[in-house]
């Protein structure tokens, strides 16, 4: 990049507004009138406003002749001094968006005879594509400007395996950039790569998933999942680890894919697998990263591939992994990061269309609601198109089954609804959910895709942090405790969560329908439940802490809504007290498969809870109206919640179900309603292999969950 020296500056800030900035010391020399010059003529600029700034003098001018984007313009002062006209705030106006919105295909479109390269760069005055091949000499092809600010060129020949970069001239400066739409990239994402469509056959097509509340989501990080020395997997830290079947720990316990299948979850959610920064793909074990540093949104990450130097390998192995999971009845959710990029100034977005894809504050500075230095301006039409195009691509090319949206609240509602429409048309039955936090980005509250606006986004789920904190205590206050940790003040909030957070008694609904409530007590973010509890209750022994975590898991897995489990939570995962392990070592982040063996009984307990939920629709009521009709709270005390699912003849094979959650080590006797005998399926000691008949009262001995049922066939149990 060559630095341009300018005697003064001029910017297009609206379709016919040009701002001229004169150095303060040159104010008496470079004076109005100003003229706008094109290659063939010039026009007068009328000064509408003028201001004295700290080091410059500002003139706001109006042109009767709108700027022709894609052409070189200059502004000349009365002194004869000239400067090139740069793209300013006009890039962020609705008029610009409307004039240059393009609904066609972008990127490299391959055929065996030729490849068409297209890039959307409406502010650019010139563009080219630079092609190279490891075994051949490179060439640069000038691109032609088409309508809507698209530059294109068709290059003949079979370009499979060719590397390419776009060269874009904005504001008189040439920049090389990777294609925003690159479907494959070289090692560490330095160039895009043209690949012919592969011949991957999906051998296990799954029917559209029935309903979000039927899901049990299991979140994991590819490297965490397999890197432990006792994981039993050969391809540690790689896509292929999840293609290995029947793996075991050293002592013969199931691990890997076999373990997840045995656990009974329905969906595996993977932390980002698109190309990200933070890990050198040539030396992947030298650093660690969760993957929330997005570089290239359409291309798979190379550090998880067996050969990061071969762009095809990462595509093939990722597809093999997804296909294998499908063969075993497991669906795949991708964690995607459309709210920010790794580094704004180096991103293909900024290099291609400076200032367009990111939000700016009222002073024209990049906003930082995400906390990482930039916010994607999803409300702009080409950003909206990009997000929808990307989601549809992963559905169609990689056959994934849903998306978890990082910092969903940064995005705007219209984009989320547009994306949902395109995505569900591409693949019905997918899950779409995310973090609906209300963050400080310059977007009106009513436009944010935040939890508070859930009623306007049917079909979109939200992480329910209120339910989470009611169960375990405030996530951001280490010593804070929730119901499962002995804080009886949270009982009512927990009961609201159990009822799907969609309105219980006089409480205002958090979400309008249970399918929009993602119920969890632990995720990759923040402390694990075990670590949080160890800080909050340092006096308690491990046995009692295990009981409390089992209680928390039972609350979530039996609640109305969509349950979500963090991998290893079922065997009390610890990160040694590290709160934010996004770039901590493998020793902190790895899934410790030794604990899977140590806590076999607890894993079995979680498996039985999942099995119970899947077997009985009463725990998966599909609407708020159904919950109001079939769920009632029987007891709500400081350390005891009892609720009943009833009138289930048309819902479940069980007629009646009672669940009791008890958070005190004391023993209590709880009286059954209506003196009807129930079968005791589960108590704090675990599941009963032969449920016994209970009359009048049931003993609740210590911390844990009691499950009773009434069926026409009293021998029926999960």
Swiss-Prot record:
The active site is at 406 (nucleophile), 435 (proton donor). Its EC number is 3.2.1.41. The keyword Endoplasmic reticulum does not apply. It holds the Pfam family Alpha-amylase. Optimum pH is 6.0. The record marks 525 as: Transition state stabilizer. It comes from the Bacteria. The keyword Cell cycle does not apply. GO terms for molecular function: pullulanase activity. Optimum temperature is 40 degrees Celsius. One of its GO terms (biological process) is carbohydrate metabolic process. It catalyses: Hydrolysis of (1->6)-alpha-D-glucosidic linkages in pullulan, amylopectin and glycogen, and in the alpha- and beta-limit dextrins of amylopectin and glycogen. It is an enzyme of class 3 (hydrolase). Keywords: Glycosidase, Hydrolase. Belongs to the glycosyl hydrolase 13 family. This is Pullulanase. It comes from Bacillus subtilis (strain 168).
């Amino acid at each position: 990049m060559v630095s341009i020296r300018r005697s003064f500056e001029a910017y297009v800030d609206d379709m016919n507004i040009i701002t001229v900035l004169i150095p303060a010391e040159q104010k008496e020399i470079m004076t109005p009138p100003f003229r706008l010059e094109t290659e063939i003529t010039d026009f007068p600029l009328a000064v509408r406003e003028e201001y004295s700034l700290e080091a410059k003098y500002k003139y706001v001018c109006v042109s009767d002749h709108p700027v022709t984007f894609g052409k070189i313009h200059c502004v000349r002062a009365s002194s004869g001094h000239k400067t090139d006209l740069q793209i300013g705030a006009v890039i962020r106006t609705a008029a610009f968006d409307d004039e240059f919105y393009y609904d066609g295909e972008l990127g490299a479109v391959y055929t065996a005879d030729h490849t068409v390269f297209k890039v959307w760069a409406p502010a650019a005055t010139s563009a080219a594509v630079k092609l190279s091949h490891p075994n051949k000499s490179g060439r640069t092809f000038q691109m032609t400007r088409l309508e809507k600010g698209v530059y294109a060129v068709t290059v003949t020949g079979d370009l499979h395996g060719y590397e390419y970069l776009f060269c874009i001239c904005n504001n008189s400066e040439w920049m090389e950039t990777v294609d925003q739409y690159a479907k494959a990239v070289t090692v560490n994402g330095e160039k895009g790569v043209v690949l012919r469509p592969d011949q991957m056959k999906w051998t296990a097509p799954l029917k559209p998933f029935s309903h979000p509340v039927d899901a049990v989501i299991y979140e994991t990080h590819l490297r965490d999942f397999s890197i432990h020395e006792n994981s039993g997997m050969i391809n540690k830290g790689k896509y292929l680890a999840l293609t290995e079947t029947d793996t075991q720990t050293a002592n013969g316990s199931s691990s890997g894919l076999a373990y997840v299948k045995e656990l009974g979850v329905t969906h595996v959610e993977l932390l980002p697998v698109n190309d990200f920064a933070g890990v050198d793909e040539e030396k992947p074990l030298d650093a660690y990263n969760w993957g929330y540093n997005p570089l290239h949104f359409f291309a798979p990450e190379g550090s998880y591939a067996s050969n990061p130097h071969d762009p095809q390998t990462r595509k093939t192995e990722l597809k093999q992994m997804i296909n294998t999971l499908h063969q075993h009845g497991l669906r795949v959710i991708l964690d995607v990061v459309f709210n920010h990029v790794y580094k704004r100034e180096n991103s293909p977005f900024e290099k291609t269309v400076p200032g367009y894809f990111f939000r700016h504050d009222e002073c024209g500075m990049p906003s930082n609601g995400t906390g990482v230095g930039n916010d994607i301006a999803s409300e702009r039409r080409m950003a909206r198109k990009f997000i929808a195009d990307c989601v549809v691509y992963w559905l169609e090319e990689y056959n994934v089954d849903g998306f978890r949206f990082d910092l969903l609240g940064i995005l705007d509602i219209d984009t989320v609804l547009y994306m949902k429409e395109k995505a569900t048309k591409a693949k019905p039955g997918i899950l779409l959910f995310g973090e609906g936090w209300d963050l400080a980005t310059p977007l009106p509250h009513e436009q944010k895709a935040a939890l508070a606006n859930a009623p306007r986004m049917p079909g979109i789920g939200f992480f329910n942090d209120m339910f989470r904190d009611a169960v375990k205590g405030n996530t951001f206050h280490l010593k804070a405790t929730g119901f499962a940790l002995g804080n009886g003040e949270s009982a009512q909030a927990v009961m609201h969560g159990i009822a799907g957070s969609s309105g219980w008694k006089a409480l205002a609904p958090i979400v309008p329908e249970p399918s929009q409530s993602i119920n969890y007590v632990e995720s990759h973010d923040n402390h694990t439940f075990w670590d949080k509890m160890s800080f909050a209750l340092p006096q308690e022994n491990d046995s009692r802490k295990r009981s409390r975590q089992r209680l928390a898991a039972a609350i979530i897995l039996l609640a109305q809504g969509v349950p979500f489990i963090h991998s290893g939570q079922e065997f009390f995962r610890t990160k040694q007290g590290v709160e934010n392990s996004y770039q901590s070592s493998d020793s902190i982040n790895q899934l410790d498969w030794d604990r899977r063996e140590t806590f076999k009984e607890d894993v079995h307990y979680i498996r039985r809870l999942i099995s119970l939920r899947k077997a009985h629709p009463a725990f998966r009521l599909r609407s708020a109206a159904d919950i109001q009709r079939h769920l009632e709270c029987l007891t709500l005390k400081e350390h005891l919640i009892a609720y009943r699912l009833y009138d289930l003849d048309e819902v479940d094979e069980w007629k009646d179900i009672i669940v009791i959650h008890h958070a005190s080590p004391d023993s209590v006797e709880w009286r059954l309603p209506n003196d009807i005998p129930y079968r005791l399926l589960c108590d704090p000691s675990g599941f009963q292999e032969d449920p016994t008949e209970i009359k009048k009262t049931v003993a609740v001995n210590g911390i844990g969950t009691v499950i009773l049922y009434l069926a026409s066939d009293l021998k029926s149990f999960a």
